[in-house]
UniProtKB/Swiss-Prot annotation:
SMART domains: G3P_acyltransf. This is Glycerol-3-phosphate acyltransferase. The chain crosses the membrane at residues 1-21, 56-76, 104-124, 136-156, 161-181, 183-203. Pathway: Lipid metabolism; phospholipid metabolism.
Length: 228
């Protein structure tokens, strides 16, 4: 039992460190001499990088953040495919390895999301976990991941507001998980992860309600920065 718990703890620590990789901060700092945390919304995610540094660095950050989310899930599945991990699971008294793996997948996914928003490398600050959540969804179920991305793109095309698109996409995940018949752990991830991502957008929701949320190409006003 102890060995199995230690193994899972190590997996979750690595998942957190993957999620905590502050790609937006590092790219801004290393290549542009800019602390992205002190610019725009203060987020280290691709949207703030886009507003602050431009298209290319934003695209790089987006790809890295999607990849690190997917990698956290791939790590769990790889470890649980190894014979020694399966033996430890059985010795611990867990006979249904597939179900154990599914629960570990969602726990690792949630921890990676938290890592993105609360990165140990930059004073427990970070982004809003939209891109990393997409990577996790694509790794869990590519159908749900692409469905969520489609919702995001449609709303973004109509509204040109990234935060609104992210919020509606986060809401849609639960329905997509349910209607595609995903396992219960994945449906729980959709609900808890969606709530967390929406909570990270509280300041955006306040600006949306006040009709002050910037669209693509616009930057936050001084007043909005003070209230971010």
């Amino acid at each position: 039992m102890i060995n199995w718990l230690v193994l899972n703890a190590v997996i979750l620590i690595v998942a957190y460190l993957l999620g905590a990789t502050p790609s937006g901060y590092w790219i801004g700092s290393w290549f542009y001499g800019v602390d992205i945390r002190e610019q725009g919304s203060g987020s280290t995610g691709a949207t703030n990088v886009l507003r602050t540094l431009g298209n290319v660095p934003a695209l790089v950050v987006l790809v890295i953040d999607i990849f690190k989310g997917a990698l956290a899930i791939a790590l769990v599945r790889y470890i649980y495919s190894l014979v020694f991990a399966q033996n430890l699971t059985i010795i611990a008294g867990v006979t249904d390895i597939d179900t154990a793996k599914e629960w570990m997948v969602i726990i690792a996914g949630l921890i990676a999301i938290v890592g993105h928003t609360k990165s140990i490398w930059i004073g427990f600050k970070g982004g809003k976990s939209v891109a990393s959540s997409l990577g996790i969804l694509l790794a869990i179920s590519w159908v749900v991941g692409l469905g969520t991305l489609s919702v995001f793109i449609v709303v973004l095309t109509i509204s040109r507001i990234v935060s609104l698109s992210s919020i509606i996409a986060a809401i849609s995940v639960s329905g997509l998980m349910f209607f595609t018949g995903q396992p219960l752990p994945y449906q729980i991830f959709a609900i808890t992860g969606g709530i967390y991502v929406i909570w990270r957008h509280i300041s955006n929701i306040e600006r949306l309600l006040a009709c002050k949320e910037p669209r693509i190409g616009q930057k936050l006003s001084t007043e909005q920065k003070m209230n971010k």
